[in-house]
Structures are given as structure tokens and as C-alpha cells.
């Protein structure tokens, strides 16, 4: 990795006594947790920490800016649109479409800039106003760089139109032109030139244009030498400028705000048919001449220079270092990747540069309480590590309402992330059970197809029934539908409730066979058999014979199964003895009822029909 | 095509509602309210689409919506209604765990007003009835539902209808004393949660619901327990369904899949069946899929309940120009429609029926 270019900045944590130098920290996905500690070996007494709070330190504050949020949202729409039309981008229209996308991005940046500028003017607090203004200049620089990249890398303007694009570029970014000379430099002559050039794509070839320009240049030179303008020094220097005389141009340094304005003006008058590959020579010399050894190039200058040198990787690298947020480099790199300009050399961690930048950007979005939804789409378009990153991030989104949970689940289901669906549904189902919302808990386990949890919820219902003697939430149990098949316990619950319903409707024979099948088919849990057998008692005691002999035998077998399997108790205590007593009484009653029923059933079945 | 204005507002919009215009007035809607969600500080904002712009050459109004004012809101904004109140009811919805005395607050998921009564439902399965001038709830039905109640609407004044997350519609009559619903309707089969409900403005027995699978169902609450029509609509949860208040043959739905659909069941205009429309609109024809149609009282036939498939075609139009993140909410009033999305944008159109 490269070495840092400068000293790391020191950030003071408010409230923490930094002279004591006792802090602990831990890294998070996009931030750091810091708090004050006090490890004091000498004194044993308890000291109250000077600062009893934990601080979250974030490097990226842009995500929290209200105005920049619009940038993130709008550019997300453009990004997703670009990925979607990728397959349709073929042939000649491809370049035009990509240029259109680039212009869309730039217009979004400009809109943000405008709004922030308005806010900066309207701000009452000067510190706030300064902050907004600096934000405006950062956005302006971003747009400047993007525009240049669009001209050089996406539009790939050839010699000829190249200069026109560069002229537009400079004009867009140079605001102060209030002097006649500056007017001439900025607007009048290019207009003359434009009529001279006509629009690109015409029948004039580059050589024709060059000849014409050469002719005009010679004429200017002749005028200068003849001394036509000797009477007016202004006109004379104007003529020199038009001849591309660098010294004359540099005299007007105050009007040319920066070296790239100087560069383009110089090219306009001396090398209007400059080829793209020659640009960097002129750029470097313009920069040197303009700075004149007084100041050193700023980061922005280096970035622009790298662009003129067609070193895309250097541009991206410098931008990454200079800007505090990954937004710019992520989107620009993605667009350049669509132009097939990035070599696919792999970085250290196995993914290419575009993917790395998108992952970083998207992770930053996930650290935001609200913009995480945008991050999902960015992860989708990272073929290697996107899915895995999404899986890790999406489980950690705090779910405060069901509505939010539903959205997160929908995202997971659309991408077949069954593990995450399961774990989220389980969390929500547990919360519901704790809040005694058994219906909700059941619907969450149905959504996750989680049989184990459905069993848990059913057990709760059955326990409630045993305690209270009646079912709660009948609206749910009565209407389970095919979801009943999710787990055996749930099926049992549904069928048991059906038994009660049949009993209530006095359809005793159906109720009886249902009850029996519940036990013989083994879906009833062992612990519940006693309850089921006790439910059978009233059926056995009815005047008419309900259980057939066969069924009675079955019931007796079940009872024996139950009683024989009972473990021997250890130390009996009073409660246990009482329970045992109740149990024994029940068993005896059952045995008696079963025997009586058997007798009646045998007699009934043995008799002739009709008797 | 209708002009639809989009504006990015730096907050995810969970609800939008037009401010009601006085009945019988010729004014069109010009103010709407929005609520945000998922922010550390949520806001309820009022926006105006009044004459801020200039008249363009067609005589239409230009300019997008402007913020009038906003206030902070604690928690996500789940539902909005307009009424004049002087009260605030906190802790209307809460969870209690068995055996413990503490209460945790539960999200309130829906609210509906019919001056002066206000009904709220929540994730705790509770229904509350408030009056605008009373401090305490007039009536509370605890544990009305074992699952989450997602939405509520008035059927007739003493009756409300709720939908829940196990796919049931329940009708509650406040004149009755018990805590049981007077009627339960549901679709057999998969218990798909229902998220939204709206009643036909003129025919109080016709109700439309939208579910988690994006299915639109039309119900007749007098007839049986099954829906009259099931229409496969969206690919993801349908968040809101609205009948147009003055043109009830038109229905609007919006969904998590990022689309907003206009369902036109009016059968009178033959040119509507033409396939030649201006660009940007995709029109699909769909026949009703009928299930379980009992004998409908013939004198009052709503186009939504009609049985003749050959005669009744519904034209469906998608109103948003590009696919976006989830459209969470929409509202229609007269020729105006407003909707809000998770992409932090609000869309407004003033020429719905152009």
C-alpha cells in the first residue's frame, strides 16, 4: 500500500480528558466507538469516569447532509438505470447513451450545488454559511473533474471537436468575466472561430480546417509586424494574444482564474486542432507557466493533469484520497467501466477496482439509518462479493416496526437469501411470543417455513388451553388452512380444535374417531394423551355407544402405554402425592369407563341388526 | 400523458394524504401532507401545489410542490388523517407480557376518522375508539386479533372493517357490547397477510383489499366469506389501495415493487379500449377472475362486482415513468394524485383523467 501523504489529523473527543490518555475503541463497519476508560493500578478507589458516554466517530459526514441525500437518491436511480440498459447498449448508439448518462449525473451534481448555494446565502450563522460554501466548492470541483473525464474518456472527442468541448468546459466553470478583454478572450473570438469551424461532423476535414486556420494566423502575424495596431497598445496586445503569444496571455493572469483556463485559451489561439494525445504536453507547460514557481499544484490540479495524461487509474486514486466520500469515485468508475476503459487487473483483495469502490460506497450507505435501501441495489451489481456483503449487512438492520421488517424480508426473498429470511422471521416471531401475540408469531413462522418455531407456538397454545381450559385466539386456530401442515404440532392443534368443534356440534361419532386417530397416528404429544383420554370420558359415558369395540381396545392400549411408561418418582413430596392421587383416580375412572363401554359395544355389535 | 412532477425531498415518505376540500366546493386539491419514516427524526410536512409556478403555453400550471411547514414526529409516521383535534393520545397501543406489569409500546399501524370519531389499530391487535373532544378512549377492544392489524376503514358509521396479517377481514360493530367481530371473511388457502383496505365511496358493501403477494381482492361483505374477484396485480406487497372518491370506477394501487397502477373499470368509453396511446404508458387488458359469485342484487351493480367477463374489461395503466424503490403511499382527490416513495421522492400529477 502507498504511504500516507501527510500527517493524520487529530480529532478531539469532547468531554474526554485527552491528557489522561485513557481511551478504548473498537471498529465498526463504517465508524469507530470510543469511550473513556480508567485503568488505575495505584488507587483502588472507584472513580467515576469523567465522561460517561460512548462516542461514535464517523469519517463520512456527507451521508447525513440533507441536500446531499438528494444526490445519493437521484444518482442511485441513474446507476440502476445504467446497469439495466447495459445489455441494450450496442453499436453506435452506445456512446451517445453513455454520454447521456454522464450528463445526467452531472446535472444532478449541479442541482445539488445550486441548492446548497442557496442555503449558503440564506444561512444566518457565518460558520454554517462557510461550511455550505466549502461544500459547494467541493461539488463544483467534482463536476469539473467529471466533465473533463466525460470529454476525454466517454465522448472521446477527436482533434477538432475536442477543443470545442474544452471551451464549453472552461466556460461552464469560469464565472467572472467582466472585462472587455476578458470578454474577448472568453466569448467573442470563439464565436468568430465557431463560424469559422462550423459544427463538428460536417464535411470539412481536419486538414481543411487547419489550412484555413493557418491562413488566418499568418494574416494576424502580418498585421502585427506591419504595425497596424501600433497606435493602440491594447489592440496590439490583443493581436499578440490572438497569435497565441504566451507572454501576452500571462499578462492577463488575473482574468484567467486558473491554469486550465490558460491552457484552453492558449490552445485556442496556437493549436486549435490539437490531438488528444498531445494534450498533456500543453497541460503540463500551462500549469508550470501559470504557477510560475510561486505555488505548488493542489490536489485538484494533479487530478486534472492525470486526466489530461489519460491515466484513469491515477485520476481515480487521487480522487479517492482527496474526497471524503466514495460517492464520486464509485459512480465515475462504474461509468468508465461500462465504457470498457478499465483494465481488469485485480487488486489485493480479489475484486476489481469498480467492485471495490462500489462495495465501499454501499457499505457506507448501510451505516446510515435510512439510506441502507439504496445500498442494496449497489450490492446487487457487484458480481463477486456483493451477495455475501449484502447477506452480512441486511441481518444487522434494526427492525423497529413490522413494516420495516416486511421490506427487509422482501429484499431477502427476492434474492433467495433463505438463511436471512429464516433468522429475521425467527427474531420477529420470538418478539411476538414474548408480547403474547401468538397469531403474529405463527404467521412469521409460516412465512419462514420454520417448522420448529411453529411447534413452539403450538405448544404455547396447548399450554394455554391446559391452564385455562379454553382456547385463546380461536380466530387463528379455526382458520389455519393448509399452513396446518407446517409442523406436526400445529396439525395436532388444528385437529384438536376440530374435535372440540365436532363435539360442540354434537357429531359425536366423528369426534370420537378423530380423537382416536389423534392418538394412534402419533401426532399428539405424549404429554397430552392424558388430556385426550380425559376428553374421551364424556363420550364413553354417553347413553348411546359411540366408541366401537375395536376403538375401545385401541383406547385401552393407549392408556396402558401411558401408564406403563410412567417413570418411578424419587422422593415424593406433598404436591406430588396429591398429583399422583389425582392421576390414579383419573386412570381408575378411565379404566372403569372403558370396560363398561367395551361391554356395551360388544353386546351391541354382537346383536342382530335392528335390535 | 399526464404530467407528473417528481421532487426529491431527503426523507423516505411513508404516507401522503390530500387535505380534504369542503364538500360541494369547486376547488381542486392544493395542499397535501406527508409523513416520513426511518429517520432519526421523522417529520410530518405540509406541501402546497398552489399557483407557485407560471402559466405555460397550454395554460397549465408549472412548478413543483413547495414545503409549507413541518413538525417533528416521534417514531415512524404510519398513517395520516385530517381532523381538527386538540388532544394527543400517547400509549394508545402497547404490549403487555404475561406475568409482568411493564408495558412496551407497540406500533399503531392505522388510523381512520369520521368526524368526530377516530379509530386506531395497532400491532398489539387492539382497536381503540376515540372522540375528538374526549381525553380517554371511548371504547377499547383488547386482543381483538391475535395477529397484527394492518389497516382499518369505516363501513357504515358504527361499523368498521379491519384487515390483519393472517389474511382475515373482520367487521366490528360498536353498537354491540362484546369483544367479538360480527363477521369474519377470509380467503381459504394460504393465509396471505392483507395490508390495505378501502371501501367503495357509494356502495358500502364493496371493499377492496391488497395483500402481501400483491393480489387485489374485491369483496362483497353481504355475500359469503369469500372475495368476489381476485386480481393478480403487483409482484410484491401492495401498500395502499384507493377507490377514487368521485369516480369510483377508478381504483389506484401502489406497491413495494415500485409501481403505481390505475385500474379503470368504467365500461362506457369505447376509445379507452384502443391500444394506441401516447408513449410512456403501458396498458394491459384484463378480465375479471370470478370466484364464488352468489346472486347479486341486480338493481345495484357495481362495475367491480359485475359478472360478465366479455363486457367488463379493466384497463390498467402504470403511472410512474421509471421503476423506482417502493411506492409506499398514494392519495387521490379530484384530478390530482400524489404518491411518495422510498427513493425519497414525491410525485404529483394534476391531470389524472386527461
Where in this protein do the model-derived segments appear?
Chain B
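Short loop/turn segments that connect beta-strands within beta-propeller blades
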Residues: 50, 132-135, 174-177, 221-224, ...
Amino acid at each position: 500500500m502507498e504511504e500516507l501523504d501527510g500527517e493524520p489529523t487529530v480529532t478531539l473527543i469532547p468531554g474526554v480528558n485527552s491528557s489522561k490518555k485513557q481511551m478504548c475503541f473498537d471498529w465498526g463497519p463504517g465508524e469507530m466507538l470510543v469511550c473513556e476508560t480508567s485503568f488505575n493500578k495505584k488507587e483502588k478507589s472507584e472513580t467515576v469516569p469523567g465522561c460517561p458516554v460512548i462516542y461514535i466517530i464517523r469519517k463520512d459526514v456527507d451521508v447525513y447532509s440533507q441536500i446531499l441525500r438528494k444526490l445519493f437518491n437521484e444518482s442511485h436511480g441513474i446507476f440502476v438505470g445504467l446497469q439495466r440498459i447495459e445489455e441494450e447498449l450496442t453499436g453506435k448508439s452506445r456512446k451517445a447513451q453513455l454520454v447521456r448518462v454522464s450528463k445526467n449525473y452531472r446535472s444532478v451534481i449541479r442541482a445539488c450545488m445550486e441548492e446548497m448555494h442557496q442555503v449558503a446565502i440564506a444561512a444566518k450563522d457565518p460558520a454554517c454559511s462557510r461550511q455550505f460554501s466549502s461544500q459547494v466548492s467541493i461539488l463544483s470541483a467534482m463536476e469539473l473533474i467529471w466533465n473533463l473525464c466525460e470529454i476525454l474518456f466517454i465522448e472521446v472527442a477527436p482533434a477538432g471537436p475536442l477543443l470545442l468541448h474544452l471551451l464549453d468546459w472552461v466556460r461552464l466553470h469560469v464565472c467572472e468575466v467582466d472585462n472587455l478583454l476578458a470578454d474577448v478572450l472568453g466569448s467573442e473570438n470563439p464565436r468568430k472561430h465557431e463560424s469559422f469551424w462550423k459544427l463538428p461532423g460536417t464535411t470539412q476535414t481536419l486538414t481543411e480546417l487547419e489550412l484555413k486556420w493557418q491562413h488566418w494566423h499568418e494574416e494576424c502575424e502580418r498585421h502585427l509586424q506591419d504595425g497596424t495596431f501600433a497606435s493602440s497598445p491594447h489592440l496590439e496586445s490583443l493581436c499578440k494574444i490572438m497569435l497565441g503569444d504566451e507572454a501576452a496571455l500571462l499578462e492577463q493572469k488575473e482574468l484567467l482564474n486558473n491554469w486550465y483556463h490558460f491552457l484552453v485559451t492558449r490552445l485556442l489561439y496556437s493549436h486549435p486542432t490539437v490531438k488528444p494525445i498531445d494534450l498533456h504536453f500543453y497541460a503540463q507547460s500551462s500549469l508550470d507557466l501559470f504557477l510560475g514557481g510561486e505555488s505548488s499544484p493542489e490536489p485538484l490540479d494533479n487530478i486534472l493533469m492525470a486526466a489530461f495524461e489519460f491515466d484513469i487509474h491515477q485520476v481515480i486514486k487521487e480522487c479517492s484520497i482527496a474526497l471524503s466520500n466514495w460517492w464520486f469515485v464509485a459512480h465515475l468508475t462504474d461509468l468508465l467501466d461500462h465504457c470498457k476503459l478499465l483494465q481488469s487487473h485485480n487488486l489485493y483483495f480479489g475484486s476489481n477496482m469498480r467492485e471495490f469502490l462500489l462495495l465501499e460506497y454501499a457499505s457506507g450507505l448501510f451505516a446510515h439509518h435510512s439510506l441502507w435501501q439504496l445500498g442494496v441495489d449497489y450490492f446487487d451489481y457487484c458480481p463477486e462479493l456483493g451477495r455475501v456483503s449484502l447477506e452480512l449487512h441486511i441481518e444487522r438492520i434494526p427492525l423497529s416496526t413490522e413494516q420495516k421488517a416486511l421490506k427487509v424480508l422482501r429484499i431477502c426473498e427476492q434474492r433467495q437469501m433463505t438463511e436471512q429470511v429464516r433468522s429475521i422471521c425467527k427474531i420477529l416471531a420470538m418478539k411476538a411470543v414474548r408480547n403474547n401475540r401468538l397469531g403474529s408469531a405463527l404467521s412469521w413462522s409460516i412465512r419462514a417455513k420454520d417448522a420448529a418455531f411453529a411447534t413452539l407456538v403450538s405448544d404455547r397454545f396447548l399450554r394455554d388451553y391446559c391452564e385455562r381450559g379454553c382456547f385463546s385466539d380461536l380466530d387463528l386456530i379455526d382458520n389455519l388452512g393448509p399452513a396446518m401442515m407446517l409442523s406436526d404440532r400445529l396439525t395436532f392443534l388444528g385437529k384438536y380444535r376440530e374435535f372440540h368443534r365436532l363435539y360442540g356440534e354434537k357429531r359425536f361419532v366423528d369426534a370420537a374417531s378423530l380423537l382416536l386417530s389423534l392418538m394412534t397416528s402419533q401426532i399428539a404429544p405424549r404429554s397430552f394423551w392424558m388430556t385426550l383420554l380425559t376428553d374421551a370420558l364424556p363420550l364413553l359415558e354417553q347413553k348411546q355407544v359411540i366408541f366401537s369395540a375395536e376403538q375401545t381396545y385401541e383406547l385401552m392400549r393407549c392408556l396402558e402405554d401411558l401408564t406403563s411408561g410412567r417413570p418411578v418418582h424419587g422422593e415424593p413430596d406433598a404436591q406430588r402425592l396429591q398429583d399422583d392421587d389425582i392421576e390414579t383416580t383419573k386412570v381408575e375412572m378411565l379404566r372403569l369407563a372403558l370396560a363398561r363401554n367395551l361391554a356395551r359395544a360388544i353386546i351391541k355389535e354382537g346383536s342382530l341388526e335392528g335390535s | 400523458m399526464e404530467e407528473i412532477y417528481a421532487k426529491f425531498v431527503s426523507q423516505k415518505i411513508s404516507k401522503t394524504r390530500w387535505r380534504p376540500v369542503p364538500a360541494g366546493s369547486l376547488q381542486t386539491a392544493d395542499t397535501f401532507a406527508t409523513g416520513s419514516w426511518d429517520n432519526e427524526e421523522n417529520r410530518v410536512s405540509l406541501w402546497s401545489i398552489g399557483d407557485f409556478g407560471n402559466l405555460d403555453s397550454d395554460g397549465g400550471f408549472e412548478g413543483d410542490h413547495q414545503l409549507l411547514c413541518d413538525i417533528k414526529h416521534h417514531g415512524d409516521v404510519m398513517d395520516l388523517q385530517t381532523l381538527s383535534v386538540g388532544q394527543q393520545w400517547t400509549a394508545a397501543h402497547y404490549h403487555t407480557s404475561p406475568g409482568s406489569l411493564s408495558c412496551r409500546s407497540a406500533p399503531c399501524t392505522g388510523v381512520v376518522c369520521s368526524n368526530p370519531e377516530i379509530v386506531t389499530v395497532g400491532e398489539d391487535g387492539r382497536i381503540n375508539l376515540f372522540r375528538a373532544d374526549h381525553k380517554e378512549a371511548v371504547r377499547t377492544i383488547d386482543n381483538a386479533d391475535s395477529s397484527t392489524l394492518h389497516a382499518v376503514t369505516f363501513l357504515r358509521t358504527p361499523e368498521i372493517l379491519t384487515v390483519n396479517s393472517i389474511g382475515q377481514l373482520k367487521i366490528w360493530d360498536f353498537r354491540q357490547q362484546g369483544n367479538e367481530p360480527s363477521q369474519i371473511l377470509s380467503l381459504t388457502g394460504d393465509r396471505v397477510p392483507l395490508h390495505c383496505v378501502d371501501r367503495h365511496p357509494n356502495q358500502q358493501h364493496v371493499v377492496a383489499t391488497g395483500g402481501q403477494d400483491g393480489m387485489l381482492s374485491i369483496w362483497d361483505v353481504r355475500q359469503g366469506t369469500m372475495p368476489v374477484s381476485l386480481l393478480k396485480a403487483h409482484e410484491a406487497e401492495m401498500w395502499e389501495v384507493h377507490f377514487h372518491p368521485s369516480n369510483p370506477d377508478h381504483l389506484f394501487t401502489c406497491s413495494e415493487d415500485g409501481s403505481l397502477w390505475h385500474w379503470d373499470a368504467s365500461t362506457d368509453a369505447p376509445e379507452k379500449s384502443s391500444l394506441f396511446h401516447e408513449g410512456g404508458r403501458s396498458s394491459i387488458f384484463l378480465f375479471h377472475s370470478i370466484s364464488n359469485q352468489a346472486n347479486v342484487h341486480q338493481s345495484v351493480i357495481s362495475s367491480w362486482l359485475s359478472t360478465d367477463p366479455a363486457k367488463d374489461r379493466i384497463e390498467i395503466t402504470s403511472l410512474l415513468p421509471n421503476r423506482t424503490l417502493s411506492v409506499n403511499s398514494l392519495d387521490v382527490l379530484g384530478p390530482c394524485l400524489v404518491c411518495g416513495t422510498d427513493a425519497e421522492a414525491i410525485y404529483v400529477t394534476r391531470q389524472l383523467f386527461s
